[in-house]
Amino acid sequence: MAVNVYSTSVTSDNLSRHDMLAWINESLQLNLTKIEQLCSGAAYCQFMDMLFPGSIALKKVKFQAKLEHEYIQNFKILQAGFKRMGVDKIIPVDKLVKGKFQDNFEFVQWFKKFFDANYDGKDYDPVAARQGQETAVAPSLVAPALNKPKKPLSSSSAAPQRPISTQRTAAAPKAGPGVVRKNPGVGNGDDEAAELMQQVNVLKLTVEDLEKERDFYFGKLRNIELICQENEGENDPVLQRIVDILYATDEGFVIPDEGGPQEEQEEY
């Protein structure tokens, strides 16, 4: 039977989005580029097969699933495996299959802890187990978003007393796996242009992922800030410590004034 894991709090042990994808791709020899691709449920099914051989009807898992009803079928297989191994976790299938970053990221963070608590280190050939199948990429994940308007970074109508510093959230985008290099000695200019466009699209998707992740965590910090402001008159030392951490900045960092040239420098 499985070792159940109930802690879902954010800790320093939680992996970042990039580290989580790297762990999944390395463990299952997949080529995922987005957390949202976990919405098919196929990766979780194979992880269960790795942890508890025979607990999942892996042959019934649709690794090439592209439609929501196929995702739901995969999660039903996962639920059956959970029940068979005594896993108490309730799978929020209706949320996961929508392919939203936040829901899928929270679930995979729990699953990573569950995996670590149950993995015994035995050898496992993921490609052979799934008979060479590769996961499909949903059309919405590969369509270039060249004309998609960007959401403003600050959309709150009520400005905080002191803005939360977000200078650490700007990360250099890295091209994810999946870009196929062609032999430079074969093909022509059209092939090179197509390859460059593919790389540009991958980078754009990576940037969008980073922006989603940034907004996700910034929203959590903003909620914490509002709670602190609502209770600031209580003189609670723990509350004051939280406020100090929220407003802490790196040495030498100056919060730019609203309006003026500084805002233009932040655009990219």
UniProtKB/Swiss-Prot annotation:
Residue numbers bearing the N-acetylalanine modification: 2
Modified residues (N6-crotonyllysine): 66
Chain intervals for the UniProt region annotation (Disordered): 146-191
Region annotated DCTN1-binding, chain positions: 208-268
Single annotated GO MF: microtubule plus-end binding
Composition skew (Low complexity), residue ranges: 146-160
Region annotation (Interaction with CDK5RAP2) ranges: 185-268
Residues where Phosphoserine is found: 155, 165
SUPFAM superfamilies, per database record: Calponin-homology domain, CH-domain (SSF47576), EB1 dimerisation domain-like (SSF140612)
Residue ranges annotated for the Calponin-homology (CH) domain, each copy included: 14-116
Post-translational modification: Acetylation at Lys-220 by KAT2B/PCAF promotes dynamic kinetochore-microtubule interactions in early mitosis. Crotonylated by KAT5 during mitosis, promoting astral microtubule plasticity and dynamic connection between astral microtubules and the cortex during mitotic chromosome segregation, thereby ensuring accurate spindle positioning in mitosis. Decrotonylated by HDAC3.
Entry keyword set: Acetylation, Cell cycle, Cell division, Cytoplasm, Cytoskeleton, Golgi apparatus, Microtubule, Mitosis, Phosphoprotein
GO cellular component: centrosome; cortical microtubule cytoskeleton; Golgi apparatus; microtubule; mitotic spindle pole
Protein family (similarity comment): Belongs to the MAPRE family.
Domain characteristics, as noted in the entry: Composed of two functionally independent domains. The N-terminal domain forms a hydrophobic cleft involved in microtubule binding and the C-terminal is involved in the formation of mutually exclusive complexes with APC and DCTN1.
Record's function text: Plus-end tracking protein (+TIP) that binds to the plus-end of microtubules and regulates the dynamics of the microtubule cytoskeleton. Recruits other +TIP proteins to microtubules by binding to a conserved Ser-X-Leu-Pro (SXLP) motif in their polypeptide chains. Promotes cytoplasmic microtubule nucleation and elongation. Involved in mitotic spindle positioning by stabilizing microtubules and promoting dynamic connection between astral microtubules and the cortex during mitotic chromosome segregation.
Quaternary structure (record): Homodimer. Heterodimer with MAPRE3. Interacts with DCTN1, DCTN2, TERF1 and dynein intermediate chain. Interaction with DIAPH1 and DIAPH2. Interacts (via C-terminal residues 206-211) with APC (via C-terminal residues 2674-2845); the interaction inhibits association with and bundling of F-actin. Interacts with CLASP2, DST, KIF2C and STIM1; probably required for their targeting to the growing microtubule plus ends. Interacts with MTUS2; interaction is direct and probably targets MTUS2 to microtubules.
Protein name: Microtubule-associated protein RP/EB family member 1
Gene: MAPRE1
